Design a protein with these regions (language model features):
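Catalytic Walker B motif of ABC-type/P-loop ATPase nucleotide-binding domains
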Residues: 189-193
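ABC transporter nucleotide-binding domain
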Residues: 207-295
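Short, charged/small-residue-rich alpha-helical element at the C-terminal edge
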Residues: 263-334
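Conserved ABC ATPase "signature" region
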Residues: 34-39, 131, 135, 142-160
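Conserved ABC ATPase signature
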Residues: 123, 164-168
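Conserved catalytic motifs of ABC-family nucleotide-binding domains
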Residues: 185
Length: 348
C-alpha cells in the first residue's frame, strides 16, 4: 500500500484507490496480404496490463506529481479516475464517488486537462466555448462571469478570448484550456502533460497560475509530466509508476536522498586545467572548458572539498544535488518489466 494521510480535516481522503488494475487486449496486425487474410480467421492478440493493482490515497489540497516513462500507465490512471474508462479490477473513489459511474454530482466537481487534446472549439473564440461550458454545467451567470474574469486576469489572456482558437499559439491555447477547465470551480483537477511543447515563459506562467489556484481554492491536483521543472515548481509529493506498478511514493526531497548517494561539485578555473591538475583532484571528472564536474559521496564533501581548492586558478565552486531528471531516469532504467505483463494468445 502507498498511502498518504486523510483529508486535512481528519475526514476521508479526496481520492482513494485500492488494487486498481487495467488490462487491454491488443490484436497484432500481420504483414503481407496472405497473412492478413489468415488473420481474418485466426488472430493473435496480446493482453497488456497497463496498471497492475495500484493503491493510493490523496488528501484534499495536495499537489501530486505522477511520473513514469511512456507506457507506464500514467494516462490510463487519470482516465480511470476521471471515469473515461472502467478498470479490470479494483476500486476507486474520487470525492466519494465511483468515477466510472459518471453521476452528475461527480462530473461537476472535477476537471481533466490533457495537453494534446482540446476542449475549446477550434474555429470559435474561447469566449464562445466558455459560454457553452456555462450552459453544460448550468452555472449561475453572475458567478460564472466573476470566476471567468478572475481566471482570465490571473493568466493575462484577456486580449485572447475573442480570437479564434486556431489563430493562437500552443501556449496561449493551453492557458485558455486551463481557464475553461476551472470555470465550474472543480475540487479535483487532473493535468496530463499540460506544459508539453511550451516555451519557458509559458511554462513559468502556467506554474505561477497553478500555484495560485491550488493555494487560494485548495484544489487537489494530480499532474503527469515528463518535465522535472514542473515537478520542482509545483509538487511536494511524487509518485513514480513503472510497468503499471508504483515504485516510489514520497516527498520530492526524499526521492533525492533515497536514490542518490553523491552530490555534483562544479569547479570553475580561470583557464582549462592541466591533466596533472585534474589527476590531483582524486576523482573521475567531466571537463567542459574551464569547468570541471565531479560526483562525490555526500559524506566526503567536507573532507575533500578543501583539498580540491588548494592551489591557484579556482575561480568558483558550486555543490548541488544530482538533477532530478537524472534520478528519475535512473529509476526508470533500473526497473525491468515484470514477467507476465504481456500474455500472448491465439484467438480464433
Amino acid at each position: 500500500m502507498h498511502n498518504s494521510g486523510g483529508d486535512g480535516g481528519g475526514g476521508r481522503p479526496v481520492i482513494e484507490v485500492t488494487d486498481l488494475a487495467k488490462a487491454y487486449r491488443v490484436y497484432d496486425k500481420p504483414e503481407g496480404l496472405l497473412a492478413s487474410v489468415r488473420g481474418l480467421f485466426r488472430r493473435t492478440s496480446r493482453r497488456v496490463e497497463a496498471l497492475r493493482g495500484v493503491d493510493l490515497e490523496v488528501k484534499r489540497g495536495e499537489f501530486l506529481a505522477l511520473l513514469g516513462p511512456n507506457g507506464a500507465g500514467k494516462t490510463t490512471f487519470l482516465k480511470l479516475l476521471s471515469g473515461i474508462i472502467t478498470p479490470s479490477r479494483g476500486t476507486a473513489r474520487v470525492l466519494g464517488h465511483v468515477p466510472w459511474e459518471r453521476v452528475d454530482d461527480f462530473r461537476r466537481r472535477f476537471a481533466l486537462v490533457m495537453g494534446q487534446r482540446n476542449q475549446l472549439w477550434w474555429d470559435l473564440p474561447a469566449a464562445e466555448s466558455f459560454r457553452l461550458h456555462r450552459e453544460i454545467y448550468r452555472l449561475d451567470p453572475a458567478r460564472f462571469a466573476r470566476v471567468r474574469d478572475e481566471l482570465v486576469e490571473l493568466l493575462g489572456v484577456k486580449q485572447l478570448v475573442l480570437q479564434p482558437v486556431r489563430e493562437l499559439s500552443l501556449g496561449e491555447r493551453m492557458k485558455l484550456e486551463l481557464v475553461a477547465a476551472l470555470l465550474h470551480e472543480p475540487e479535483v483537477l487532473f493535468l496530463d502533460e499540460p506544459t508539453i511543447g511550451l516555451d519557458v515563459v509559458a511554462q513559468h506562467t502556467i506554474h505561477d497560475f497553478l500555484r495560485e489556484v491550488q493555494a487560494t481554492r485548495r484544489v487537489t491536483v494530480i499532474l503527469t509530466t515528463h518535465y522535472m521543472k514542473d515537478v520542482a515548481a509545483l509538487c511536494e509529493r511524487v509518485v513514480v509508476i513503472t510497468h503499471g506498478d508504483i515504485l516510489y511514493d514520497g516527498s520530492l526531497a526524499e526521492i533525492v536522498d533515497r536514490f542518490t548517494s553523491h552530490k555534483v561539485v562544479t569547479l570553475e578555473f580561470d583557464d582549462p586545467p592541466s591533466s596533472e591538475r585534474l589527476a590531483g583532484l582524486g576523482f573521475p571528472c567531466e571537463v567542459r572548458g574551464p569547468q570541471v564536474i565531479l560526483r562525490i559521496d555526500r559524506g566526503r564533501i567536507a573532507e575533500v572539498l578543501p583539498r580540491m581548492l588548494q592551489g591557484d586558478g579556482v575561480r568558483d565552486v558550486s555543490v548541488e544535488d544530482v538533477p532530478l531528471e537524472e534520478i528519475v531516469a535512473e529509476l526508470f532504467r533500473s526497473t525491468a518489466p515484470p514477467s507476465g505483463r504481456e500474455a500472448v494468445e491465439v484467438v480464433t
